[in-house]
Amino acid sequence: MRFLFLFITILLCSTTIKAQRLYSESGDIYEKSKRNVVDHAKLGVFYELKFRKDSTKLDDYTEAQTVLMVSDKHLLFSDYNRLALDSINDYLASSKQNKKDQKAREEWMQAIKKWTFFFVTLTDLEEQKTTVQTYDVLRSYEYTYPTPQMDWQLVSGDSIINQKACKKAICSFAGRNYIAWYTETIALPYGPYLFTGLPGLIMEIHDEGRNWIFTNNGVGKMPQYSDMYLYKKRYFKDLIVTTRENALTGYRNDIEDFDNLSIEIYKVKVEKNGQMVTPEANNPKRPSNMLELQW
């Protein structure tokens, strides 16, 4: 029974990480998101993302709806439902009447469930610097570094993706080999995440093992949510601003050692001989299959 209690406690902690940041300490008042808005998107490029959290489970994909937001000076890539969640949350937080809006509350919960990709990349096109924020897991991280330059090879091959004629290219990035399909009919050298530099918009890109698959499913003006922003540090009490190496190492450790680290972070207790005690942190590691394997 004590192990069941421990499992349930950790599970509840992990599934409420995002939600707990959107409430006041009293638990019944929505708190407006705190953002650093740097620009406004002129264009949205949408990508369906499928990724494996465990590379050994070949048919077990997590899905996300992501968006590349484009302005003259910046690119921002994130889960689209992050934008939706913040918008709904701020509406609920704006008045006592709004927080009772049952439809909005239900949409808020749905957006939380749909937000599954927890990296946000903001690229300054003039300075060629990228700031990345990662959320969820146990802690949140932020780092800024020179925007990576992809060493593309244009190779033979053609395809039709989302009704666009595409050509093939390959590259290696952060420990994975990628195959990309780009269209010269949209003369933007951009793509999902940090994949840029081809002579046309990337319509699909995936690693050779198909662990991470981005497929374009729309291009056009942002119908809503045009603000390009990262969160202010004070919005996440646990946001760690550090180097890329430290951030990605920490993020990987948080995934793999979640069951042990969460005992300390969430101050988990179990019953033993009639007393509540801290359990031993000797659980096996979980698998991780991050997009970036090397840094």
Q: What are these model-predicted stretches?
A:
Residues 20-149, 158, 165, 210-295:
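Extracellular or lumenal secretory-pathway regions
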Residues 3-13:
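Sec-dependent N-terminal signal peptides
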Residues 26-31, 181-190:
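Charged, amphipathic alpha-helical segments
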Residues 15-19:
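Sec/Tat signal peptide C-region and signal peptidase I cleavage site
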Residues 141-181, 189-191:
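Extended beta-strand-rich segments in extracellular/periplasmic secretory proteins, especially
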Residues 52, 61, 177-179, 187-224:
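Structured soluble/peripheral alpha/beta segments that form catalytic or ligand/cofactor-binding pockets
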Residues 47-50, 167-172, 203-206:
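Short beta-strand segments that buttress and anchor functional surface loops
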